[in-house]
Amino acid sequence: MEEVIERFLKYVKFDTQSDEDSNTVPSTDKQLKLGKNLVEELKEIGLSGVSIDDNGYVMAYLPANIEKNVPALGFISHMDTSPDMSGENVNPQFVENYDGNDIVLNKDKNIVLSPKDFPEILKYKGKTLITTDGNTLLGADDKAGIAEIITAISYISKHPEIKHGKICIGFTPDEEVGRGADYFDVKKFGADVAYTVDGGDFGELEYENFNAASAKITVHGRNVHPGSAKDKMINSISVAEEFMRLIPKEQAPEYTEGYEGFYHIVDFQGSVEETKLQYIIRDFSKNKFEDKKKLMLDAAKFINEKYGRNLVEIEIKDQYYNMKEKIDEVKYVVDIAYKAMEEVEVKPLVRPIRGGTDGARLSFMGLPTPNLFTGGVNFHGKFEYIPTFAMEKAVEVIVKIVELYAEK
């Protein structure tokens, strides 16, 4: 299974950081470089229908080798890495037989991956880890997923004794900026059901995610010379702070976990004359999600009525919804993945995604798509790492899922 590690190390050398401020598709041209490389690799391992479209979506399939009518099965990962940290000149480091102590990522900058800060790393004592050098993210999210999918499909294609239906492969751009499913052609992809391989911790199996919305708030003020401002000036920064106090502080990300939703302020820029705020709103429950949006609208209304003028403008846009309602209609996709993990001695960790994946959007586009683990930990930053055995096991899980579908 060294093959999956070699692929991963090759892919992380491609800088594929996406850009949320870009209006192009994909948001960065550099994602296309990896996409074109993957196209050649998929052709080399003998897949059919290999293509990359103008938007950067890579698709291919392995034809069925059985007559039996079984669901066409898809596996999907994304090529871009997070805008949160550089993905240029990634320099992976190997930590063999991890001893449970601090890992010095960068001596010069005193960057240390410590179990004091990240206690879950102790689960991997005795294992080989791939870390960053402290200057970039690693890119396991989601180049580990790409490596695992291609390695599994390559193995299946070389072993005709493994019976399987049609297997569809898709690699998307711009997942990290919320646009991964925007131009995904479900009909062209050709699968009945699919899995994203975009999860984190070893054993994760996810089919619930947040309902998500964004809120943009503009607060209008009135600037007057401060020396003569009494009863005239309206400081939009002060009004914005007043608005923020109406949003439950205890429902911020840093105070929530599990199935708890949150309000998260992600940007605040202002002057006396005008202040702009951006929030994201998240909840697993559709009712609580709607309540959260209403609370924000009511907060704006309250302030406008208090001041007797429309100082606060608010625009709320839904982004994606909890895929559970769509997955429940075809629950066998979760049951098969669960069984596959157990059969290759991986303990399934069924937990909600406190975020979103391409699969959430795709599930509402007619392609039910739960999420499988990659094995990566601490995504989007310099403390990202991945145990090599987890990548190898992910390959085994994908192969076993394919086998179980052929038996369905």
Segments and roles (model prediction):
Residues 20, 49, 161-166, 249-262, ...:
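Flexible, glycine/charged-enriched surface loops at secondary-structure junctions
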Residues 2-29, 130-131, 320, 380-381:
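N-terminal capping segment at the start of a domain
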Residues 68-166, 171:
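Active-site metal-coordination/substrate-binding segment of hydrolases
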Residues 234-253, 287-301, 335, 339-342, ...:
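His/Asp/Glu-rich mid-to-C-terminal helical/loop segments that flank catalytic regions of hydrolases
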Residues 132-140, 347-351, 382:
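Short pre-catalytic strand/loop immediately N-terminal to key active-site residues, enriched for Gly-Thr
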Residues 103, 127-140, 173-297, 301, ...:
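Midchain, well-structured core segments that form catalytic/ion-binding scaffolds
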Residues 238-255, 262-264, 311, 321-370:
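Active-site-adjacent substrate-binding region
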Residues 23-70, 74-76, 80, 86, ...:
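A non-catalytic alpha/beta surface segment that caps or lines the substrate-entry region
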